[in-house]
Each structure stands twice: as C-alpha cells, then as structure tokens.
Amino acid sequence: MCGIVGYVGMRSAQQVLLDGLEKLEYRGYDSAGVALTQRDGIRVVKSKGRLSTLRSKLEELALPQSSCGIGHTRWATHGEPSDVNSHPHSTPRVSIVHNGIIENYGALKERLIAKGYTFASETDTEVLVKLIDSCYQGEPLQALQAALAKVRGSYALAVLFKDCLLYTSDAADDLIGV
C-alpha cells in the first residue's frame, strides 16, 4: 500500500505535496519522496523512514519554489525499505510514483538491460519508469500508453515529465481532487 499525491498550480508544490502526504502517511511509512519540476529538469528527494525525515531533508536543501510535482509514501512490496528503493524513481526525463505490483517486471527488466538500461533498486517501479523512458519519442502520453501496453499487474501511478504531469490507474477507487 502507498500514498500518491500530484500537484500543478500556483502554490508551492513542495508544501502541497508534503501536506497531502501527511494525510496519506498511514498508507505507507517505510519511506517517502517527492519529485519537483525545476528550471533545469526534475529534482527528486527521497528518504527511508517517516515523512518527517523527508521534511527535514527538504528544509536543509532549500530548493527553489516549484509549481508542479509528485509525492509518495511507501509500504514496501518489492525491495526492502531504503533510500534507493524509495519513490519517486526517475530517469533524466521522467519521474514516477507507483502503487501496485507489476507482475512481469522481471521479464521487462531483462529486456531493458539488453537495451542498455541499468538498475540501482530492487523495485518494480524502477523497471516501470525505465520502460516509459524507453518508449518516449517526444510525446509523454504516447510513451505512457506504449509502456502500459507491455505491463501485467495492478497500478496507480503519477508520471512527471518536465512540462507534463500524467496520472493513470487500472482501478476505480481513486480519489482525485481539483
């Protein structure tokens, strides 16, 4: 189980994400993280442990204000609780947070390794973000659709590109606020 939050707007994305994650922390307290759009790309900050650890890390970093981002609290399923297994998982052009289980992540990972991708974590989410990256040809939505066509499993995920935030789920019980 995990908590996922995404935000696009005029307020500080970092603060909105942290406030949202605080309300969802009961859904996962093994780790927490955020990905925020910045002028030069996407900045990911994550940590093992409760949300308070992430808050402290973000206070120390004093990042420039962002108006778009995604956040995640994690209850570990694939991979032990650690900084490297924490979400968001990223490539230079895309970052994702994910709740669910990708059943065929092992086979997908082998194909991605054959294409030259490397992996640092033990998570199915890192496989998913690199799969989306491998499908990217300039159009974020098409990359996401192409990647999900290869996936077996359950998912709710927020996908952040520098200029685009997408959300998708295979379930009907999501809560989305506007």
Q: What does each model-identified segment do?
A:
Residues 167-170, 174-178:
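Single conserved hydrophobic/aromatic residue that forms the stacking wall/gate
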Residues 1-169:
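Conserved short alpha-helical segments that host acidic/polar catalytic motifs at enzyme active sites
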